[in-house]
Amino acid sequence: NKETKKSNSDSSKKKFTVGFDAEYPPYGYMDSDTGEYTGFDLELAQAVCDMEGWELVKTPIEWASKDAELNNGNIDCIWNGFTINGKEDKYEWSDPYVNNQQVVVVAKNSGITKLADLKDKYVAAQSASAALQLLQKGGDQEKLGKTFKEIQEFPDYNTAFSELEAGTVDAVAMDVGVAKYQVNNRNNNYVILDENLNSEQYGIGFKKGNTELRDKVNADLKKLYDEGKVDELAKKYGIEDMICLGDK
């Protein structure tokens, strides 16, 4: 079922293959009603494809394998809540389009109200995520991370939240948009700490050297922003206050 890459000269539609984490709402996830992959980033990618006459191929990836998928040519880009900061030189980036923060989620009745309360606690994060990198050696919050009892890595945030619900971890470090989605969909038994771990921005990451495709998608993104499509989708997914495309 592997998609074959088509060249531009192919008479059929050009395929635009987007790599994404399939458990990363509201950016990319499986809609349980339709059984289809959807989300803010995937709908935005579809809008670009509609402009270009391309066929969107949605390719779920293991987040820890994203670089291999990109470098092997299995995907054209990584488009899924992808943090630019600290990785500026590793990819050909689109303009930043979402302002993001890394935050910490805890159970409402945990007694944890600030970052300092995480001392000697078990904290979960996704493997190869921006949150994990922040808290590990060399990260901006390395000092905080060292106060934890342990940082536990999970392949996706649904698993991390299951551990939080079970009480095997005390907190989850994650992106604010995903955190809000999870908190709202879990009977509000959880809270996001007021103190952020950082502020950062999302971009679309293309393989180094692939400036042609990056430039094309970037131009389309600007057009979609000017036409109001980006804000329309952002409202649909509850992240309208996080869009930064118009900021200069």
What kind of region is each of these model predictions?
Residues 1-15, 244-248:
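Short, low-complexity disordered leader/linker segments with a strong preference
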Residues 15-38:
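Short glycine-rich His-centered loop
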Residues 22, 99-106, 176-180, 184-222, ...:
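Periplasmic-binding protein-like
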Residues 30-31, 45-54, 131-153, 183-187:
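Ligand-binding cleft/hinge of the Venus flytrap
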Residues 42, 57-68, 151-163, 200:
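Short helix-initiation/N-cap motifs at beta->coil->alpha
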Residues 42-51, 112, 116, 121-122, ...:
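Extended ligand-binding regions for polar small-molecule ligands
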Residues 46, 55-117:
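Acidic, polar ligand-binding/catalytic clefts
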Residues 65, 81-90, 134-137, 162-199:
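A ligand-binding cleft/hinge motif common to bilobed small-molecule-binding domains
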